[in-house]
Amino acid sequence: MGVHLEVLDTGEQLMVPGDVLEEENKGTLWKFLLSGAMAGAVSRTGTAPLDRARVYMQVYSSKSNFRHLLSGLRSLVQEGGIRSLWRGNGINVLKIAPEYAIKFSVFEQSRNFFYGVHTSPSFQERVVAGSLAVAISQTLINPMEVLKTRLTLRFTGQYKGLLDCARQILERDGTRALYRGYLPNMLGIIPYACTDLAVYELLRCLWQKSGRDMKDPSGLVSLSSVTLSTTCGQMASYPLTLVRTRMQAQDTVEGSNPTMLGVFKRILNQQGWPGLYRGMTPTLLKVLPAGGISYLVYEAMKKTLGVQVLSR
């Protein structure tokens, strides 16, 4: 757990496995990346109903049937059947490959730069490296995030598919619509990365004080630590995540374009501070199963592909 980049996919953040970063493992890089991508795909598919409920609660929280998780899920099933709970999952899985590859490449370059300055990167340097990796990957896949949000929220018959959704957005709002929510997305990276890594470092210190070997913790300890730190990071950046989703979901109406501050004010005026945490329940509920599924699938894929992890 020396480098906080475990294989954990919560649906919001896909992290690069730390064992990929060891020099001796570079020859089997494609196997690690394939294992991670498969883990993310299975994880997101398994928790897709909770993710769709989260998006609906964030966007339509003023409607009585989407104020609570169970009533929201019931409404979704009534509108489109059981299969509708997986709307938007296709592109959510599709964007794993570019997200994973970009995040890994940027983090690898940042890591090499900092290792050239120090033997071991400091806390601040790891925050910078991780934040830079997330920022660049999110910049490049933001259009896919917008499409994912629109497809997740679509009602039966609204779009014929991914390409039809993209065409309608471009015809109605232009290319700028594909970067709706970009600013709150970027701003949310800092509190997420700082909180995530700070909690992880705290847990690492507590583990070391217990007198146990920090270099070889059990899978359960590693999974629990990353899950808890990731959850805290999500809570710290959640209001910005909610605003991002609201902005991505909104169409341009009569030439108006929703701004980040405008969405913040609207939420606070209509729902108060609690409104900034709408949809938090399904978000928290999916963290543990998503992390557990991705971890187990990743380990199973490595075993299937015959990967032997070699560390320095």
From Swiss-Prot:
Catalytic activity entry: Mg(2+)(out) + phosphate(in) + ATP(out) = Mg(2+)(in) + phosphate(out) + ATP(in); ADP(out) + phosphate(in) + H(+)(out) = ADP(in) + phosphate(out) + H(+)(in)
Localization of this protein: Mitochondrion inner membrane
Coiled coil: none
Keyword Hydrolase included in the entry's annotation: no
One cellular component term from this protein's GO annotations in UniProt: mitochondrion
Segments passing through the bilayer: 33-50, 88-107, 131-144, 182-200, 219-243, 279-298
Main location: mitochondrion
Any one of the GO BP annotations: ATP transport
Tissue distribution: Mainly expressed in testis and at lesser levels in brain.
MF-aspect GO terms: ADP transmembrane transporter activity; ATP transmembrane transporter activity
Solcar repeats mapped onto the chain: 27-113, 121-206, 217-304
Keywords carried by this UniProt record: Membrane, Mitochondrion, Mitochondrion inner membrane, Repeat, Transmembrane, Transmembrane helix, Transport
UniProt xrefs under Gene3D superfamilies: Mitochondrial carrier domain
UniProt keyword Transmembrane present: yes
Bilayer topology annotation: Multi-pass membrane protein
Family listed: Belongs to the mitochondrial carrier (TC 2.A.29) family.
PANTHER family: SOLUTE CARRIER FAMILY 25
Record's function text: Calcium-independent ATP-Mg/Pi exchanger that catalyzes the electroneutral exchange of Mg-ATP or free ADP against an hydrogenphosphate and participates in the net transport of adenine nucleotides across the mitochondria inner membrane.
Name under which the protein is recorded: Calcium-independent mitochondrial carrier protein SCaMC-3L
Lineage, highest ranks first: Eukaryota, Metazoa, Chordata, Craniata, Vertebrata
